[in-house]
């Protein structure tokens, strides 16, 4: 298990050489802990996408083009030296694709390829654990609440820059209630 009851580390495993039992074990661990960390993999796109398919149904990210036609589920998220605005998710608490009304992915997979020194500071939290620690009075006040999730906001700026570079027509904000 990781720090603060969020996540688990899986060590001494090669994702390129897994049988279905090991894949199921990884998926069960992910479901139990919410986040898993598997280091030192350096997967090629084929292996990465196949692993994703082995633990769930990949969904095409609606805001960017996939790596190519063969790998529509893989997106390159990068921070360029010329970027002046906040990057995807940088400095803001967020939930990936929570602004989708339907077909929200169950999991998000990240793989760092080039992480500058002093970067790579993604932090994970558990809404389930936070809720469980609330006083009963607050729980009763929010139990029937509905959240409004939007793809707009300060962190959208870098995404809009990438859309422009890729020749993607600037996308409208997406919003959903859950």
List where the protein language model places each region:
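Non-heme Fe(II) oxygenase catalytic core, chiefly the N-lobe of the double-stranded beta-helix
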Residues: 1-178
């Amino acid at each position: 298990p990781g720090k603060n009851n969020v996540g688990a580390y899986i060590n001494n495993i090669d994702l390129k050489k897994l049988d279905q039992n090991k894949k199921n074990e990884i998926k069960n661990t992910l479901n139990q802990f919410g986040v898993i960390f598997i280091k030192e993999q350096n997967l090629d796109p084929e292996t990465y996408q196949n692993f994703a398919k082995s633990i769930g149904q990949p969904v095409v990210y609606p805001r960017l083009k996939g790596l190519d036609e063969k790998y529509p589920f893989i997106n390159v998220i990068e921070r360029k030296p010329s970027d002046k605005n906040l990057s995807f998710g940088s400095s803001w608490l967020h939930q990936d694709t929570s602004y989708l009304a339907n077909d929200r992915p169950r999991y998000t997979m990240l793989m760092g390829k080039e992480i500058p020194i002093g970067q790579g500071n993604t932090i994970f939290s558990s809404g389930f654990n936070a809720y469980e620690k609330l006083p009963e009075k607050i729980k009763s006040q929010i139990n029937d609440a509905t959240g409004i999730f939007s793809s707009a906001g300060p962190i959208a700026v870098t995404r809009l820059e990438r859309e422009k570079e890729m020749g993607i027509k600037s996308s409208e904000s997406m919003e959903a209630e859950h």
